[in-house]
Amino acid sequence: MRLAVVGATGAVGTEMLAILEGRDLHIDELRPVASARSAGRKLTFRDSIVEAVGIGPTAFEGIDIALFDVPDDASAEWAPVAAESGAVVVDNSAAWRMHEQVPLVVPEINPTDVDHRPLGIVASPNCTMLALVVPLGALHKRAGLKRVIASSYQAASGAGRPGVDELWDQLERAAKDPEPVTRGLAREVLEPGTTFPHPLALNVIPQVGSVRDDGYTGEESKVAAEARKVLGMADLPVTTTCVRVPTVVGHGVSVHAEFEEPIDAAEARTLLGAAPGIEVLDDPGRGLYPTPLEAAGRDPCYVGRIRQDPYDPRALEWFCVADNLRKGAALNTIQIAELIVERGSGSRTGA
């Protein structure tokens, strides 16, 4: 198979290459595709040196599958070009996720959707939604989802390298002048950067994305809409509050889920423990529960603090964490490509 990684020099593109190193996916040719600024950059892949080519009409010639991690506008422009060249596009941007002719796929939940791609494009969901939906899907099969209320705790890397750089810069400034910080006056030494609306160091910011007229942010609306699409439940009530926190990698989500049928915490632990892509860490008395540090650099969605709602036998609470650069982006995109190959649906449209 001839595989292109578009956006290969970015944070997620770099993670894609690292993950592909250890996967069993047979690759005859790996073609890194990057912006004109990064074209010509040499990368190492499976003991070989590969050179990034600039994105353009000829970049996709002979490619079977193209993994995209580029800004929305770049994906909107170049994903159709890659598809018209004969490649199956697996896209990690928001450009195609809600397009009615583009499947939005989480392999653990809706693998057969990958077969129906009339535009030759398959979308991979938002990183926060992925952490949320993997356990939801596992429990929905047993008890039937009725409603979801979730709050996210999103790492700086969700805003890309600029977000991480801004956080480190602010932490360094706070460390150099700790006196006002210890007196609760961190705002005297920290100023907002260009990535987040307030200083992120020593802080949490209850805004991820622009605020809409209804008071919800774009991120909150995306998470809800994408969860409905992946689960195939267009009318499922999903309410989210998305918060940026001063961690580097790993998005956490606190979840309240209501079901059609009664389900208790013990059964939920058993179901989640047997579900693909999930690892249960749930012994809070011994300090065993998911944290971003636990999830960083690892593939599973970690789930813990699983509790029965004391007022409703049909409701559960839990906390889950996934590495937003791996399962939240690069890994899910690669898993979709593996699914396409596995199902033998490698033609552009899957027909």
Identify the function of each model-found stretch.
Residues 1-198, 235-237, 261, 299-302, ...:
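N-terminal Rossmann-like NAD(P) cofactor-binding subdomain of oxidoreductases
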Residues 116-123, 203-214, 318-320:
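Helix-loop-beta segment of a Rossmann-like dinucleotide-binding subdomain
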Residues 120-131, 215-224, 328-332:
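A glycine-rich, Thr/Ser-enriched phosphate-binding loop motif common to dinucleotide/cofactor-binding enzymes
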Residues 137, 225, 270:
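Active-site phosphate/pyrophosphate- and oxyanion-stabilizing loops and adjacent acidic/basic residues
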Residues 158-161, 212-215, 247-251, 265-266:
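Short acidic/glycine-rich loop or secondary-structure boundary segments that cap or lie
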Residues 188, 192-247:
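Oxyanion-binding "anion nests"
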Residues 235-351:
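C-terminal active-site/capping subdomain that shapes the small-molecule cofactor and substrate pocket
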